[in-house]
Amino acid sequence: MSTERYNPRDAEPRWQEKWSEAKIFETDNNDPREKYYVLEMFPYPSGRIHIGHVRNYAMGDVVARYKRARGYNVLHPMGWDAFGMPAENAAMQNKVHPKDWTYQNIASMRAQLKSMGLSLDWSREFATCDVEYYQRQQYLFLDMMEKGLVYRKQSKVNWDPVDQTVLANEQVIDGRGWRSGALVEQRELTQWFFKITDFAQDLLDALDTLDHWPEKVRLMQKNWIGRSEGLAIRWEIAAGTGPQGFTDVQVYTTRPDTLFGASFLAIAADHPLAKALSETSSDIAAFCDECRRAGTSLAALETAEKKGLDTGIKVKHPLDPAWELPVYIANFVLMDYGTGAIFACPSGDQRDLDFARKYGLPVVPVVMPRDGDAASFTVGDTAYDGDGVMINSRFLDGLTTQEAFDVVAGKLTAAQLGNEPVAERRVNFRLRDWGVSRQRYWGCPIPVIHCDDCGVVPVPKQDLPVKLPDDVTFDVPGNPLDRHPTWRNVSCPCCGKAARRETDTMDTFVDSSWYYTRFTAPWEDKPTDPAVANHWLPVDQYIGGIEHAILHLLYSRFFTRAMRETGHVAVSEPFKGLFTQGMVVHETYRLGSGANGQWVAPADIRVEDVDGARRAFLLSSGEEVTIGSVEKMSKSKKNVIDPDDILGSYGADTARFFVLSDSPPDRDVIWSEAGIEGSHRFVQRLWRLVSEAADVLRTSASTPAKDGAGRAVSQAAHKTLQAVGADLDKLAFNKAVARIYELLNTLAAPLTQVASGNADTSFVAAVRNATEILIQIIAPMMPHLAEECWAVLGHSGMVSQADWPVFHAELVAENEVVMPVQINGKKKAELTIGRDADQNAVSQAVLDLDAVKAALQGQTPKKIIVVPQRIVNIVV
């Protein structure tokens, strides 16, 4: 029979409403089944979802639906990472309150996500700007404060002059603010810090336990934590060369083996010695100011021109007091790493070598490769920073670098300078405490009060929440809380005198560092229900972009430990499994060239094949447009696809299927009209084949065939079922999709035969069983289509609630084996034969192979040795 085309605009809202009414995705914390917690990184409510969201949330939804079908009690929640600068920017630009802007955006994006058919537990939804959420965050802050994990200090900060706020080092990219793009300035401010460094070793060691994280992410975190073992060495200042009160300069180094290659010392612009010199030298003061204005990110330090200023100070070499070295202030040395001072061995470090060449300082090779020649080994334009053997190093010559390290460490830790050891062994970390103060309104208020008599006073827990005032304006840059007298001015909880609220709010990365815990019991009065949190955590599968490898993921790992220390959870790691998906990318299109060129949106062009080449033309005028490179979707280059357009034209299932099908999930997927059209054709073809055969299938049993014509159908379905299950367990969505395409191709003829009425009972039963398997394995990816097909086969329940089918072992067993065939021990051919073939049958089949006949050239074998199901060897 002929059927109507599948209409997603009718089917998708209908099934979404049925799911919602039945509350089938709401999770019961008391369900006794094994738990599975799947979570995609929650979105910032910018107002619209993008295609990257579609891919991210489609992946998470496949996992959630699959695990639900496998019998797990699945938690799959959704919320909103809702504080941050964009809301304040919108307030300034559009004269709308950040709260109103944010909640309007949430409403729009919620509707978009619901139209995707995601199996989310919306009953647990929250936004981080909800008072109910940030009240519990303030509670956590107070607990961490009491535990000594929060402190306040004066520090040099990265100041974003556009956003008028402080940025963490990680938020400074190439010397610019990560959001605004403004050149970052250095300022001294009193800031709140989380003591993430207390957990540095634990955070590092535990990376080895995260077996289900990408190795790349673990390596990025390892490098960011940056553990090193070295020596802290005191270099005596030569008499008469340093300012009063300074006797030595302490340097931390991981390469004391290279001390005989030392050429100079370099100190940071904020080193106490540099500050003291600045008081008496305007040149030094000006140079230090110049250094402070430069970026402090690694990228900025690596790419900036290396500059230094000779201070006139000399220090004595710790292994030879008669040898004096100059001390420079250098723009590549930071005060917050090590001691803020380095010794430079130019032959072993490229940065030091460039500096030494620039300022005419000595370069002495002290390490050469093991197979090098000491007499001829030199350092030219490239430093040698590898291991090897020591040269030009007096009593260290001939030792390996590790041996030299130990010898120097032994000597200097035993030597004295002013009744203290010249050196001590030390472990150092690159990781710094997390500065969480932000000078903005739209964030979680820090729950402390400043009293002239009592100092810093935590807000009593019974007085929480410290709510943001609604009556603020954004007429001028900066923090409106500083200008709000009735909110800012309060009585001290301790003495009752006039006091002031803290007007800084928390870094938004705090909000996203514990939200996964709140989802486990979002109705709780305290931040967590520890028993429930301990049941659900860690998150079994976390999905998000690799751009969060350091910031969000490291902060979350710290926060789980902090919550463990304060009694809110018993676990240490937040995420058991981590998957970092690739981006959705698209061709770029440009009209004209040079400064007058304009980017053109994909919706405004048509692409044609002209003489075998792809060419693009404007829809409006027919003008030719240049097809550019495939790039990350961006508004600036207009190569964006609006998910609403795709969902409206093709439906959610087609969009979901395409973003899952076209590329391995950890790689970028190239969006193409041909690709989405192909997925849509598959949807229509599947619906047509199933619906046309439905009248016959509906009256049949669902039974796989063990023999006869239906056996091949059953084998194909059950082998696909087995393989797709294995693919989904490995998140290999694209492989699962490819197998689903193959299975539909296999079932096309049998379904057509069933629809025509020319099939016997056992064949129809086998086809029904195979079709139900097909419907169930597409259900995690295309849930609406699956429900429609499931219903048309006569099922009263929903496929979203059906158990995952079980493959029959006898139908997936391989009935043939491939055996290598050797002649006198050398492989000449391969034989494919039935697994149960006897020795005589194998021998005869081998002799019938063309390759064997050609190799034997008429000779009669002396014997044929058959190792059953393994190998055949012919002896001639």
Swiss-Prot record:
One of its GO terms (biological process) is leucyl-tRNA aminoacylation. InterPro entries: aa-tRNA-synth_I_CS, aa-tRNA-synth_Ia, Leu-tRNA-ligase, Leu_tRNA-synth_edit, M/V/L/I-tRNA-synth_anticd-bd, Methionyl/Leucyl_tRNA_Synth, Rossmann-like_a/b/a_fold, tRNAsynth_Ia_anticodon-bd. It catalyses: tRNA(Leu) + L-leucine + ATP = L-leucyl-tRNA(Leu) + AMP + diphosphate. CDD domains: Anticodon_Ia_Leu_BEm, LeuRS_core. A motif ('KMSKS' region) lies at residues 632-636. Keywords: Aminoacyl-tRNA synthetase, ATP-binding, Cytoplasm, Ligase, Nucleotide-binding, Protein biosynthesis. Its main location: cytoplasm. A motif ('HIGH' region) lies at residues 43-53. It is found in: Cytoplasm. The keyword tRNA processing does not apply. It comes from the Bacteria. The keyword Aminoacyl-tRNA synthetase applies. HAMAP family: Leu_tRNA_synth_B. This is Leucine--tRNA ligase. Its EC number is 6.1.1.4. The gene is leuS. Belongs to the class-I aminoacyl-tRNA synthetase family. One of its GO terms (molecular function) is ATP binding. One of its GO terms (cellular component) is cytosol. ATP binds at residue 635.
